[in-house]
Amino acid sequence: MAQFPLLGHGFPPEPVNHPLGGPRGLDVAGPTICPAPEEEPSRPEQVQASLDAPEHFMDEPKSTESATSPSKLPLASSHEHQDGGKPCEALQAELQGAAERVDALLVFGEGLAERSEPRAWTSLEQVLRALGTHRDTIFQRLWQLQAQLISYSLVLEKANLLDQDLEVEGDSDGPAAGGVWGPWAPSIFPTPAELEWDPAGDVGGLGPSGQKISRIPGAPCELCGYRGSQSSGQGFEDLLSLGLGHRKHLAAHHRRRLQKPQDKKRQGPPSLPDAMLEVDRGVPAPASRRPLTFLLLLLFLLLVGATLLLPLSGVPCCSHTRLARTPYLVLSYVNGLPPI
């Protein structure tokens, strides 16, 4: 819904001590606003035609307050709200009409403020603000009523479907001894994991196909075959108690499923003696010792080669240094060699 901007937001407010239509002296020093000539053709013609005689708006402030009250707008009547069977399109049409009327009042107020005296602008601005506030309050309440009507219609539709289900069950011969599913027995065929449906984890009461299912009295549990309390009544309270009991039973299954992984975690890993007992102490294969034997033999050959090569390479230098440093006697013959 389009909201038109209010006039005179930048002007200081002044007290209103006179009626809206009363004569006042012209304030020469006050601000003056020239009406914009391009705004008038932009107004809808039907709004201007419907607001040709606005004497009550200028003569009495009380008439303005009565026009802004929520009782004057065409709201949905009380008996229509109680029935809940009226379509929401009619309510939306009435809301649209009320919105157009309120917009027309706002347009008229703006035009009146442009054509009136400068001293009356503040009072007209206050009236327009009050009208806008009433408009917002009214439509906020109307949206709440519309949401309530939609919720009531959904509840009534669900109640009608439940009544139809009960009528169909009453017309039939009734379920067998084990309910509509028969006596519960564990299946011997494996169920694929992607197609498995867990009733314990079903929070919204949906079946395997994702559709809403209704709890049938006397039907066994999908997990353990528990039937719960048998009730002879078919009233709303009996159905509600059966549904709550079934939900509690499924919640107990869900809690037990959640407690199993926690118990496994609490057990913890096996201790060191247990791990030692679990180790296989058989004779290892001879192939595992071959790499170790080969490495030891290679190391031994390297040591032997080093001991053989080091003395051969160090003999000349070692003997030379040893002869140079060792003291020895030198005999010199003066008269020649001794006789032989």
From Swiss-Prot:
Family label: Belongs to the nesprin family.
The keyword Transmembrane helix belongs to this UniProt entry's keyword annotation: yes
- Taken from the record's topology, the Cytoplasmic segments are 1-291
Q: Where is this region: Disordered?
A: 1-86, 254-277
A Gene Ontology biological process term:
establishment of epithelial cell apical/basal polarity
Which residue range or ranges hold the KASH domain?
283-340
Q: Short name of one Pfam family for this protein?
A: KASH
The UniProt keyword set, sorted, is:
Disulfide bond, Membrane, Nucleus, Transmembrane, Transmembrane helix
Instruction: Specify the protein's topology with respect to the membrane.
Output: Single-pass type IV membrane protein
- Domain of life, per UniProt, equals Eukaryota
Places the protein is found: Nucleus outer membrane
The species this protein belongs to is Rattus norvegicus (Rat)
Composition bias (Basic and acidic residues) maps to 53-63
Q: What remark about domains does the record contain?
A: The KASH domain, which contains a transmembrane domain, mediates the nuclear envelope targeting and is involved in the binding to SUN1 and SUN2 through recognition of their SUN domains.
Query: What exactly does this protein do?
Result: As a component of the LINC (LInker of Nucleoskeleton and Cytoskeleton) complex, involved in the connection between the nuclear lamina and the cytoskeleton. The nucleocytoplasmic interactions established by the LINC complex play an important role in the transmission of mechanical forces across the nuclear envelope and in nuclear movement and positioning. Behaves as a kinesin cargo, providing a functional binding site for kinesin-1 at the nuclear envelope.
| Membrane-crossing residue ranges in chain numbering | 292-312
Q: Cellular component terms, GO, for this chain's entry?
A: meiotic nuclear membrane microtubule tethering complex; nuclear outer membrane
What name does this protein carry?
Nesprin-4
Major site of localization recorded for this protein: nucleus
Subunit text: Core component of LINC complexes which are composed of inner nuclear membrane SUN domain-containing proteins coupled to outer nuclear membrane KASH domain-containing nesprins. SUN and KASH domain-containing proteins seem to bind each other promiscuously; however, differentially expression of LINC complex constituents can give rise to specific assemblies. Probably part of a SUN1-containing LINC complex. Interacts with kinesins KIF5B and KLC1.
Per the UniProt topology annotation, the Perinuclear space ranges are 313-340
